[in-house]
């Protein structure tokens, strides 16, 4: 580990990355050269050129000049340059990005397709805004349809669609507008009515399904007027341009367009459009009157074709209505047959169900009858077994009585001989019991007396001491004697630790201290709660001249409270005296606070001692 760590640190210092951070690690320019020349403890020592070779026993012997090896040119050559640094490893970020993009797109498309198949609103959003979303959803819907209906693609006996015979018109059939060469030598490549005849025909052509006969006639008349106006304007231009030529022949009446009264069929409209285009081309020629007969004949044939198409359509409609009527009749007949079969099947099923019901009812009746018979047989067997058991019990009881009588006879005979021994044993047992009970009574009385003595010791310590004296040892003795008594332990725990650690004053000390406190309270009896120095001085002076008065029952002034407290203390009633002093307020209560604390501790100790004495008396009563 040490070798690898030193080697890695040296390679890091010599690597190209170290040159970029040289300003941070090595502030001097020659630091890298010094580090390159250093040798670490874990590296092998490089061979030094020209250094003396250590002598060995074999090298010290003389070597002939012939055997001395000549220096090879390779040894004198400079050391090879260090290998180039390894190329940086490709991170493959683009491949990872492409992989994550493909996975994310796949999950997104999969989730979108799943939600689109479950929700109609999301289906509309997904198929409308997501590329290829509609194709994907359609593919999965088809798969689901084929999964639920696997026989969809089988046995497809559909009638072939009757699209009719395709009508094709050869390119060189029909009439042609070019009959002979034009004598006037007009250039047909110039712009004129003949160049826009197709446009006029397209403008005049309406939609097959929406055009009415009146609209068709109006469109034809409009096209005639436009063609005549354009022809007239072209003739005027020619006259202006060709003034030296001969005057042109008068304009020929244009050929009317072909119309079909009820040509709402698409084929008829296409045929009329083509024929009108031909008429427009012919009308643009000066020799249009030569083809008027052929055009009129073609118009008649076109009308005849339209009438035939209308007749064929009416025949097809009538045939379809007949087929529909036959289908309705067949359907009604099939429905009646289906209802009849349904009634027959229902009647057959009802009869079969009734027969099965009767068979099942008989089977259940037999099963219940067998069950009742089995229950009766078992009840009879149980009754017989019960009688047998009663007989056996009576026999056992008779045997027991016989044995008991025999035993009584034997015992009577034995009692006559061993009665004195039994009486002696009973008397000894009674004596032992009485001895044990009296021993417990004596132990309990002894413990109670010891507890009473310990309590008297505590009381004597409290009453005979002239100064407050601790009574920890006496209290510990009381607690040890009353071990396990929860009442005594609770009473001892209720005593303030300060009371038995420092002691409590006696009754005479409390009375003496009360008299000193009463003088101070009288001096401060006239002070308000927020009194200052002047108030204290005034209260001190007035307290000297105040007259003492008798205690008035129910009066709450300071003098009355002090007099009542003093009388109670003289009677030995510390509890009521403390209650009276506790009714003081203001500075009087603050001055008597310490005295009240001492009285409370004395009362707590006395109350605890009274509880312990009462518990000791109760134990004595329980023993008696």
From Swiss-Prot:
Segments of skewed composition (Basic and acidic residues)? 212-246
Report which residue ranges the record marks as coiled coil: 295-440
Q: Where does the transit peptide start and end?
A: 1-41
- Its transmembrane ranges are 97-117
Q: Which residues lie on this side of the membrane: Mitochondrial intermembrane?
A: 118-624
One GO cellular component assignment for this chain's record is: MICOS complex
Identify the stretch(es) annotated as Disordered. 42-89, 156-250
Decide whether keyword Lyase is in the record.
no
Q: Where is the composition biased (Low complexity)?
A: 46-61
Q: What is any one GO biological process for this UniProt entry?
A: cristae formation
Q: Where's it found, cell-wise?
A: Mitochondrion inner membrane
List the Pfam families hit by this protein, alphabetically. Answer: Mitofilin
Which residue ranges does the entry give as Mitochondrial matrix-facing topology?
Answer: 42-96
Q: How does it sit in the membrane?
A: Single-pass membrane protein
List the biased-composition ranges (Pro residues). Answer: 62-87
From the record, give the cysteines joined by S-S bonds: none
| Keyword terms | Coiled coil, Membrane, Mitochondrion, Mitochondrion inner membrane, Transit peptide, Transmembrane, Transmembrane helix
Tell me the subunit arrangement: Component of the mitochondrial contact site and cristae organizing system (MICOS) complex.
Q: Which family does the entry's similarity section mention?
A: Belongs to the MICOS complex subunit Mic60 family.
Summarize the protein's role: Component of the MICOS complex, a large protein complex of the mitochondrial inner membrane that plays crucial roles in the maintenance of crista junctions, inner membrane architecture, and formation of contact sites to the outer membrane. Plays a role in keeping cristae membranes connected to the inner boundary membrane. Also promotes protein import via the mitochondrial intermembrane space assembly (MIA) pathway.
**Protein name, UniProt field:** MICOS complex subunit MIC60
Q: Which organism is it from?
A: Neosartorya fischeri (strain ATCC 1020 / DSM 3700 / CBS 544.65 / FGSC A1164 / JCM 1740 / NRRL 181 / WB 181) (Aspergillus fischerianus)
Task: Please name the gene that encodes this protein.
Answer: MIC60
